[in-house]
A protein has these predicted regions:
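Short phosphate-binding/catalytic loops that engage adenosine nucleotides
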Residues: 47, 88, 110
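Active-site signature of alpha/beta-hydrolase-fold catalytic machinery across serine-
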Residues: 104-108
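Active-site nucleophile loop of the alpha/beta-hydrolase fold
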Residues: 116-127
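Short, hinge-like loop/turn segments at secondary-structure boundaries
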Residues: 67-70, 110, 131
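Catalytic nucleophile-loop/oxyanion-hole region of alpha/beta-hydrolase
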Residues: 60-91
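Gly/Ala-rich beta-loop-alpha elbow adjacent to hydrolase catalytic centers
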Residues: 94-98, 102
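Short, surface-exposed "cap/lid" segments of acyl-processing enzymes
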Residues: 3-60
């Protein structure tokens, strides 16, 4: 069962005036409200914008418990597809888990024109792997 969305945690969508779009992704235990200011700034600059409410977020903690990466990445990809219908150039940006999703989206969608990762939640790698 899904609880009602907390006021201010609603997804955000904007039809812009350019051929560029921005997909904005919030972090784990967060909701679209935490990234709304950034999304609205992109919209004010004329970009198409999608800021989805990731599965299990923005409602009640009980809704988050059964959700997994596949749910969140699926939500991100659906939002990307919606944005791609309006924008030929897409930049993906995200905070924390949204930053990790942004990295995943870049691998899944190499046609994306850019990424912005804000404190991405990633697994640290040993120095040998990085060399």
């Amino acid at each position: 069962m899904t609880a009602p969305t907390i006021p201010g945690a609603e997804p955000f969508s904007h039809i812009g005036s350019s051929d560029a779009g921005v997909l904005v992704l919030h972090g784990f235990t967060g909701n679209p409200g935490s990234m709304r200011g950034l999304a609205e700034a992109c919209a004010a600059a004329g970009f198409h914008v999608e800021l989805p409410q990731l599965a299990g977020h923005g409602t009640a903690m009980e809704d988050m418990i059964p959700t997994r990466w596949a749910d969140w990445s699926g939500d991100a990809d659906k939002a990307y597809q919606v944005l791609a219908k309006r924008a030929s150039k897409i930049v993906v940006m995200g905070l924390s888990m949204g930053g990790a999703l942004t990295l995943w989206m870049a691998a899944e969608h190499p046609e994306a024109k850019g990424i912005v990762c804000i404190n991405p939640a990633t697994q640290p790698q040993p120095v040998e792997v990085l060399n």
